[in-house]
Amino acid sequence: DAPRGPAPDKKAGTKIEKLAQDWTADVKAFALAHEGDLVGIAPMDPLYVYEGYELTHPWVIVVGVSMEHEELDNLPPSLENTSNPVEVARQYNRAARPCRELNNFILSQGYEAKAWQGPFASALNMMPAAIQAGIGTLGKHGSLINEEFGSPFRISAVTTDIPLVGDAP
């Protein structure tokens, strides 16, 4: 597999029908079983989409992964010690993998899905979606802060039309 996870599969021809609360539980369990540390769901809001783009999926699933605090303690990076930037890149890749796996899971169930990986997710601004999905709150310094992990974690997302139930911010 690629460091950022598998390429998108083709969507299955038949939709599997379940209740929204059952899909919500399945989606969260799947992401957590595939390297995710946090999962939240929010209804899509046009404010999450950058100007010039259009996203039509009604839901956004945000997945977060924690970073290794020991590696972050090596700030600032230097020519002799490059572990901090390597850790950041490693965790962006780790955040991408559960979303790309989740994307393929949703496609295999007959629903539309698109994975968005950080740090630059083109059309999707993941920060407000993550706040609405209950992943964290916005800190004074502009970073997302999670109650358990603090600010050192990375996020990726999947937009989809699978029936879901949103989380509270």
Language-model-detected regions and their locations in the chain:
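Iron-sulfur (Fe-S) cluster-binding modules
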Residues: 1-42, 51-56
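Catalytic cores of enzyme domains
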Residues: 37-169
